[in-house]
Each structure stands twice: as structure tokens, then as C-alpha cells.
Amino acid sequence: MMRPVSARRTARLGALAAALAAGLLTAGLAVPAAAQELPASDRLWIQAPGEQSLPLGADLPGRPLDIGLYHDNDDFTVTDGRLSVDISGLAGVAEVYWPSNCTPSGTTALCTVDEVPVLGDAYSPQVQLLVNAADGAATGAQGRITYAAVATGGPDGTVEAPHDSSTDVTVGSGPDLSVGGLAPVKGAQPGDVLTMPFTVTNRGGQRSEGLRAVITTTYGLKLPDTYAECVNGTTTGGDDVPMFTATCDFDQAVEPGGTFTLPRPLRVALADHAYRERVEVSVRPGNGATDLAEEDNYAAAGVQATNTADFEARGARVEGAAGETVTARLAFRNNGPAWIGNLGSGDSVAAVDLTVPEGVTVTSAPAGCEPRTLSGGFHPNPVGAPRYSCEMPIWTLPDTERAFPFELRVDRVVPDATGRVVLTAGGANPVTFPFDPQPANNTDRLVVNATPAS
């Protein structure tokens, strides 16, 4: 069972909500220190695939099955992880080969994990089983592997994983295409042409009668070569991330254990606006055949180019008498030369943060602009807030601008009333973007009723 990363925070918020419901936090009533200090918590989790397909035939290579342990709270150190694996449910279906950190005994094994991490960049599965179909197993045979785990650490000295982690194993017959060999590239330059070969291996027990390969590149990459078997297309316009796609149908049969490569190795050309790019390859068997294990039908590799993108915040100057409503058109601009796309994280590329000038009230905010308190916290009302944060999409092209028109009511005339307009990453504070060569223009002003120059 893989637990959502945000559950710990949700649990703490739930405890606070319960306190509210009980009347512990009421207007004018001081909250005891014990109520403010929620008890620390930590929990152990098992990460394992819910399903695993195996090709029919005991003589075929086994399938790796990656299993890992992690815990919630990085305030605690968790060690001496002990993962129990029960394969009694695989009798007559599959055989398991154990790694060196597992000690088998009959149909169970105890696998050790010296240090249990929190889920993040440093995490990787610590136990890799090798599973293949049992001799004599029939197509459609099914079994189950179950897991349990404990470790040392946490607030109580011991943490234990929920007892509902398992992997369902199914024996199937058919092709199983697997993409490999696609390697990431760092330090490339705009204008470079890179060779990025990949292979497709049939790990199944039946041959694939041809295959379809879909090659997708992000906006900063182009495919300089064409293949007769491919139809090229682009995705542009609206909120869709701009991409290039080649859909290719090859009639070459791929035997069990055999491999397929393109007629010529894949090449990609970096455009002048390239920055953080990606190449994706997905495949499926031809003639409508079903792939036994689709999880390895896809591969992706990053291409990092050395480039810059000058982000700019644009403020405004407006005038109005008391009682009038005026429009202040704020804007974000990417002066290039690079495009920026947070395709991996899905985060906004930037946010335009406005501190409302004195003497005016926001009566209408643009879509996507969240009201904030002056310190950057949650504000309940969409209008009348002292601060707003307007998020950009997850990508922005060079030499493009996005406007954010605010309707402001002038409550009283304050000469030279000024509010800050600054770019953030969506948080409460300004940031320095690593690709931006001119951070000084990330800040501007909204001025209401500026004093005329003498």
C-alpha cells in the first residue's frame, strides 16, 4: 500500500478541526499550550506494485519486482527495517528468487533495510525480487504476494506498516514489449543535434507482429529526420503544452527475446529556445495484440540545455477620483530566449504577486488570482483582500505576455499610492529563478494617482 504524501499534514489539520468542533478554539478563549502542541507522529509504509504480469514459460527471464520501505516524518530517524514477504499464495503460479538482503524460510522471507528514508528524491526501492512463471503454470493463473513490515524509530520507538500491502501476480501469454536504452543528456547547447537511440525488446513468450512507436518531444526539440513509417504532428494552442509527436507503425516482427531499433538512430535538434526538454517513447504490439505488462512500454529522458529566460513583472499606473473604479493591467512577460516548462513537477512557472495600494479596494480580480492576507496567508474573500497571487500556467513561451486586469475602486485619493508587483514561485516571498539573467525586473509597482512631475 502506498500512502499519499500529504496524509500526515491532513491528519494534523483533522485534529485541529476536531478541536474546533469541540469548542476548544472559540473567539476570545485562550487556547492551552497542550492543545496547541499536537503530538508528533510517524508511520511506516510499504511501496510495492499492486499487479505484476509474467510471461508464460518457466525458461523465460524473470521479472524484477521492486519493493521499498519509507516513513512519514523526517524529524525522526528510522532504521532496522524488517520486511516480511509471504509467497505462499504463488504455489503453482510463480517462483521467486531472493536478493542477498532477504533470508527465505519456506514460503516466507525476512528482508532487511538498514536505513528507512522518507519519500523523496533520495528514496529508491531497497528490495528487488525476481519472479517468473512456475513450470507448468497455465495462462491466466493468478497468485498473490503479501507484505508486512516493522522498523525501529518514530515517537514510540517502533513503527509498523499497515497489513494490507500485496502484489497480484498473473501469468499471461503474448508479446511484452519493453523500451530501453534512452539516456538523459546534460550540458547541451541550443543548435546541437543529439543522437538518442533506444531499443524495443520483446520479453514475452509470443512474437509481436509489428509494433507502433510514438515519439514525443517537448517544444525546444525538433526531429531532423523523417521515417516513411511515421506521421508527424504538433500540439499547440490554448492551454495545451506545445509538443511534437511522431506516430510510427513498423511491420517488422519481434520474436521473443528479440529487439527492434529504428531504421536510423533517433536524433533530436535543440531549438534556440530549448531549456529543460524531454524525449518520450511509447510502444505497443501490432495487429491489436495486448501487451502483457504495459508498465515498461514507455521511457523518457531529459535533455538539459544551457540557456536563459528573462522573466519580467509589469506594473501599471492608474488615476481615478474617489468613488471611481479603474482597471489596472498587470502582466507577466517572458523575454526569452528560452521557453520554460515545468512538465515534471506540474508547478506554475511563476506567479504575479500584488500588494494592493493604500486607498483602493479590489472589486474584481482576474481568474486564477487568489486573495491573500498581507503576510501571504489565506484570505476568505475574493474581493477586498490586501494582497493577491496570480499563478501562471506550467509553461511559457519566449516573447509572450500574460495580462492580469484588476478592477480597483478608489475609496479615497492618496497621492502616489503604491503597491508592489513581484514575481514569486507561488509562495509568499519573491524568488530568484535560476535561469533568469536579470532578476531586477522581477519587481515593479502599481501606482494610483501619481503626482505629476513638476
Residue ranges and their predicted role:
Residues 1-37:
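Secretory targeting and sorting signals
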Residues 50-79, 184-207, 316-349:
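Short beta-strand elements of extracellular/lumenal beta-sandwich folds
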Residues 47-53, 98, 180-185, 228-231, ...:
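Surface-exposed, proline-enriched loop/turn segments that connect beta strands in immunoglobulin-like
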Residues 45-46, 73-79, 93, 204-209, ...:
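A short beta-turn/strand-edge loop motif at beta-sheet boundaries
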Residues 2-6, 32-61, 95-107:
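Low-complexity, acidic Ser/Thr/Pro-rich repeat tracts that form intrinsically disordered stalk/linker regions
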Residues 36-45, 73, 147-179, 281-313, ...:
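Extracellular/luminal low-complexity Ser/Thr/Pro-rich, glycosylation-prone repeat/linker regions
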Residues 39, 78-117, 211-250, 347-389:
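A surface/secretory-pathway sequence property marking extracellular, secreted
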Residues 115-141, 249-276, 389-420:
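Low-complexity, intrinsically disordered segments enriched in Ser/Thr together with acidic residues
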